[in-house]
């Protein structure tokens, strides 16, 4: 497979040189599978195999791009795309800066995040996985829905400057299972990210779903008073908050365009809890890390927060060119963010519920419809959903109706952080739309944060 891709890129490079074009050629191939469930039945089972080419032509301060979905045997159509670039360049407006043209100094071949067993997963295995996680939990009132998405992604690059190529292949799976009560209108869910087949663990999801359904059926449903609570975040909430925080606050582009909540002078400042260490770590195959970025820069661990101190901004090549900065190897389709684990020995939902409690704790596994309210202040909002629990000091458990949180990133990850689980898990944040781009974070199983304010509390589910 890799030889076919590289041979194609080299043919296209020669075709571009013959047209006197200075071109970066990006190759993207996906083999994607999706099984969707609704009302305790398969509602969709589909797959697609797509190959895309992205051409970027450079001429001084001019840059134009053209993309197409291709048949790999139809070289003529691909070369017509190059002809379109020739026609576009004279009409392009010059940029205010000189964009860097990639000059690859070596071949890069990276399949560290590829697993042939996951790539070959069958429909029967996907169905058996869902049957296992939902076994004994469905009823006339409680219905199963969700998705099982998995696939293989290949990306590769070549430029007209050298014959060196970059080639990356990875496999991924993203599972979301939801059980909902048609009469009471509550929903609970469980999720899993996988880079290899052995990561798939349907019994673990069944255990979490069983526990949540048990409490949602038996425990009292309550409207919580607004106010401040000690909150335990699940991996979904932690990962989504971290993902948005990194994109809105920790990139050079966000800094220079004025919407980051961090300033240049904040580098080195203690803005977060000393328990928080956040790194973009491309060595982590579990979260689809890759060895080099799109411009050929070697990817190395890049500390963003060290013991609570903000370290540095991430610079992609184009932003670095525009603002006169040094790129940091972040011209990638996705980051590989890791929050280090802590010292708390709590590795499962069952263990969290069994912990002795000195105060009431609001468990929020997932923050729904998360949005940035004010990026320059780092303020986000979202509501609890899919399995929140109110763990009372007296040992009892109640089921809270949805609540809204509107807080700053520094509230979630600041001095209020009480503890982090030692156990870490991968959480998948891949989009279901557009081209396949496996994305995940590695975060503590639980993070406990004090003084999180509930600004609104629903009177029902």
Question: What label would you give each PLM region?
Answer:
Residues 266-461:
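Dual-mode signal for accessory low-complexity, basic/Gly-rich regions
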Residues 1-290, 297, 306-309, 431-437, ...:
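Active-site bordering "gate/hinge" segments
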